[in-house]
């Protein structure tokens, strides 16, 4: 899912743990590898245990994700730009927007999160990436279409593993035999992530052996954003997670490829609503 979440008074970043891959035993977040025949489309499943949540900051790193709540009566409020939308059963998101927040109601035992491969997701479900980047959140029906039977079956299962099996069966039913992956775009996305968004687009073009028009067209069609926008998003998210640990503004600015601290502070305020130091005080990070 790659959401940054702050629970109650203790800051816990799901995205930070996904990036570091050090969270499985520490935070009891379960990672399930998809079946081999679906690994071209699905990155991972995450079972994220949670309790009643107050306001939580939320981000997405440009990766398409579906979040499923355990029961039909479970609900969530998702807020962006002071507009609140309510969803039952779960939601879909693919791109980061500034100042988003999540509120879950009741004692929701866990979230089941499905992270897809960006280069394959929209093509898999015949979706328009540009359209789905016009809003931060969408209901599940917008993405999965007529899925009443799937949701009903999932809500009969208490265990996340059973729900995952149902999701995989559903996706196998929509995969076209003629569906071809875009491995070069997958490689571009991986290379940007590997370098934490700090490499230039010229470096990316040189590595892949493609021109900018190819990059822009393929990123736009698959992800609804330009390669530069995606790279900038990766840079901020990695700088954010590093800053929470190191709390060294000047050091993180330099390591993350920002030209100066003012640019990092501007991005930080854009996404969180606070300056880095204000954010640390608000979250009481020690």
Question: Residue locations for each model-derived region?
Answer:
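A secondary-structure capping/hinge motif
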Residues: 219-225, 267-278
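Short Lys/Arg-enriched helix C-cap and helix-to-coil transition segments
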Residues: 231-232, 281
């Amino acid at each position: 899912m790659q959401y940054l979440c702050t629970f109650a008074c203790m800051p816990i970043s799901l995205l930070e743990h996904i990036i570091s891959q050090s969270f499985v035993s520490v935070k009891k977040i379960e990672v399930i590898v998809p079946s081999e025949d679906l690994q071209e489309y699905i990155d991972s499943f995450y079972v994220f245990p949670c309790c009643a949540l107050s306001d939580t900051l939320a981000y997405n790193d440009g990766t398409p994700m579906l979040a499923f709540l355990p029961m039909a009566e479970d609900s969530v409020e998702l807020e962006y730009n002071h507009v609140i939308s309510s969803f039952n059963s779960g939601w879909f998101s693919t791109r980061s927007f500034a100042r988003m927040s999540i509120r879950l109601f009741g004692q929701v035992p866990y979230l089941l999160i499905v992270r897809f491969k960006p280069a394959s997701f929209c093509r898999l479900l015949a979706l328009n990436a540009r359209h789905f980047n016009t809003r931060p959140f969408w209901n599940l029906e917008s993405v999965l279409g007529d899925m009443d039977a799937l949701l009903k079956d999932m809500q009969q299962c208490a265990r996340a593993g059973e729900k995952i099996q149902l999701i995989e069966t559903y996706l196998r039913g929509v995969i076209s035999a003629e569906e071809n992956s875009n491995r070069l775009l997958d490689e571009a996305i991986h290379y940007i992530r590997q370098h934490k968004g700090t490499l230039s687009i010229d470096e990316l073009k040189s590595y892949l052996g493609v021109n900018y028009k190819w990059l822009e067209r393929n990123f736009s069609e698959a992800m609804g954003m330009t390669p530069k926008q995606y790279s900038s998003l990766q840079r901020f998210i990695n700088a954010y997670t590093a800053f929470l640990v190191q709390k060294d503004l000047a050091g993180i600015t330099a390591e993350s490829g920002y030209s100066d601290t003012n640019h990092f502070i501007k991005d930080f305020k854009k996404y969180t609503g606070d300056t880095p130091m204000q954010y640390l005080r608000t979250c009481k990070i020690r």
